[in-house]
Amino acid sequence: MSQAVIFKPFVSVPSSNHSQRKLQNNIINVGVKIQNRFRVVCMGMLAPRKFLQKRRKMEVFKDAADETDQKRWRGLMLEIESTGSAVPVLRQYKTDGDQGLPRDLVLGTLVRFKQLKKWNLVSEILEWLRYQNWWNFSEIDFLMLITAYGKLGNFNGAERVLSVLSKMGSTPNVISYTALMESYGRGGKCNNAEAIFRRMQSSGPEPSAITYQIILKTFVEGDKFKEAEEVFETLLDEKKSPLKPDQKMYHMMIYMYKKAGNYEKARKVFSSMVGKGVPQSTVTYNSLMSFETSYKEVSKIYDQMQRSDIQPDVVSYALLIKAYGRARREEEALSVFEEMLDAGVRPTHKAYNILLDAFAISGMVEQAKTVFKSMRRDRIFPDLWSYTTMLSAYVNASDMEGAEKFFKRIKVDGFEPNIVTYGTLIKGYAKANDVEKMMEVYEKMRLSGIKANQTILTTIMDASGRCKNFGSALGWYKEMESCGVPPDQKAKNVLLSLASTQDELEEAKELTGIRNETATIIARVYGSDDDEEGVEDISSESSDDEDEGDDDDDDARETVLYDKPQEGSLGYGSLQTEELVGL
């Protein structure tokens, strides 16, 4: 039976879901919008958008007195934010002039910092107001103070405020108990938080929807998944439940199953929302997309969200861009970013860094440069992660001269390289077999007070073994233990792969503790890979039919060469609970 020969096109085609969605939009909106991929070529990559340009806002005031008050308040807010402390600034404003410190100004400041979730400033102002004769500190103020301590995880402060309320003859209510419970949860005392919750269930006050949201969040972050599941199941039982679970509770359960690695249950909870009459939102879909590793699956969820007439936000776009970037589908990643800009969604640091990473992974330096410059143009100034990702673009392009120049620029621009920055440069010199330069960077890192991690030491061991001899690799293997970084399985695999004789293999077996046939197989497989670039070419190829989310591959060489995202290399990769769930 003859076999069909399939030729893969030189330019990769967007995923079926994304391209079909774009085509459907084009049919509906004839002449309004053409497919993003082709428009990128016509307009130029990341062309400026009007909505990103700085515009001067016209302000309207009631009268001259209102203008004075507004500007005074803004000045006060800016001064508090710049100093990081509110009380000294408020004291100064109180003593300046005859006007003193108006009550409305203080109240507005409190409300604004509460909206900004700057609970440290809220608690500082309220603690100060407790002892001011001109301010009538009421029960509402106490409740706001205990809420602030709850958000900060300051259970000592929350307990103290609750004690004061009790002495005043005030009966603790659902707000104060919930705040105390949250303070325990955020303070790492999950059992104490659970005890408060159980007491509320048994003897009152009756837990509110917010109470249930917070206890679910506490259980999930404390890895008490069984307890969270039991609470949620109780809420689903109409006979036992005092209230129905709301959208945020469903979001938290989706996040919990993601965290537990139970994707099937997460999808089941997602699907059950419609039947229970709970509306799905952008956050719901973001929660579901966040744990998918295949760009095809992420794209399907994204398409489903749009079919449901739910508008994606910057997190939605960032998750889809990240999925395409990981799959080395840079054109699709760029297309989605352009779509985001066309939709008038303002990109964040995270979104730009994810797009930058999509090009950096494949060593596309010029495209990465364009993204890097676009950040500044759009008044989103690159941070250290942006610089480190740009550095990795040079490294992945094997342009070590460019990498060295850019590394110097990082310091010139006022940033101090961290362990990931140094590790990226070390990786580059290791790939280039330039051991001397690699060691220079390593020594600079040590002198700057940064301790090497497992990945860096494994990289140096691998390069030393390949470029020098097996004895040098042995020395670095032993160095790991002396540095307090015990060799992991990947380091052991690399050492075994560097053994070129039977004696060296036996010595490696003795050190690693691997004495079975696996050690011999590893040595044969990795020992035959003399051409490193060949290894990289193989690891970077992917079939259209393959699942792109194979991040758990235990290939030692791949780890050493940083082909997979390292922990901390892009801190924006995994989105945190509060951003997804909104608690």
Curated annotation (Swiss-Prot):
Coiled coil feature spans: none
Biased segments, Basic and acidic residues type: 557-566
Looking at the record's lineage, which domain of life comes first?
Answer: Eukaryota
Keywords of this entry:
Repeat
Quote the biased-composition stretches of kind Acidic residues, using this chain's numbering: 528-556
Q: Where is this region: Disordered?
A: 525-583
Q: Which residues cross the membrane?
A: none
Repeat PPR: residue ranges?
A: 138-172, 173-207, 208-242, 246-280, 281-312, 313-347, 348-382, 383-417, 418-452, 453-487
**Pfam families, alphabetized:** PPR, PPR_2, PPR_3
Q: Which family does it belong to?
A: Belongs to the PPR family. P subfamily.
- State what protein this is by name: Pentatricopeptide repeat-containing protein At3g59040
Q: Which organism is it from?
A: Arabidopsis thaliana
